[in-house]
Amino acid sequence: TVNAQVTTSAMAGHVADKQGEDIISALVRVVHKPSGTTYNAVTNVDGRWAIQGMRVGGPYEVKITYVGFADSVIEDITLQLGETYNLNVTMTEDITELGEVVVTGTRSKFAAEKTGATTNISNTQLTALPTVSRSISDIVRLSPYANGMGFAGGDGRSTNFTLDGANLNNNFGLSSSLPGGGTPISMDAIDEVQVVVTPFDVRQTNFIGGGINAVTKSGTNTFKGTAYVYHNNENMHGNRIDNADLGERGTNRNTTYGFTLGG
């Protein structure tokens, strides 16, 4: 059996009026702006709603409507891989014509959905971060538990690496690099990376210590692309440590070209 890891996000929340009374059967419409993907939900008897299986990233726009209340619109929401975004909204009655309606959404710092130490690295961060080797091992250093490919003092060979839910592991311990035996995919193809350490989430299974969960980019309604040139040579390596001369550096040059196109 193959157990896929988490490849989606979720959103949940509560809708109430200014008196704190639950609003039942309010329509919640969530739109993924880059692709136009739409998700719908209806609040239950407690005024709560939830949507599972959503695309990671964003931006998302949330519109909440109910008879007798002004529409509530919340924009520029970004979802993290494997996390539930909590959005609590207070709606304003629309008895008379209003010049302006201000809707305030809150998100608790203490989420019951947290299931362990997690670090999410978004596509915006992946684009901005410098990387010497253009590999996952450079990126996961953003996790405070990371030491190379090992986490919380564990051996890097026990780290679980999944891409779009599929395991890419070095099960026989024959590789000295990633659990999958090297960089399995171009960094430009990755949409988001999640680093988890000893999670107690039943969806994250079949490993001990640390897990790296990555998802690739998917199509949108906008045609776009990226391009890069990665160059490394002996002039970028030092030949002296303190006062010790390590000798002349040998020729060691490597140039990698790459590009992506999608829409």
Regions found by a protein language model. Give the residues of each.
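Membrane-embedded beta-strand positions of outer-membrane beta-barrel proteins
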Residues: 225-229, 261
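Periplasmic N-terminal accessory/gating domains of Gram-negative outer-membrane beta-barrel systems
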Residues: 44, 50, 70, 75-90, ...
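Short helix-loop capping/hinge motifs at secondary-structure junctions, enriched
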Residues: 221-222
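Periplasm-facing N-terminal accessory domains of Gram-negative outer-membrane beta-barrel systems
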Residues: 2-111
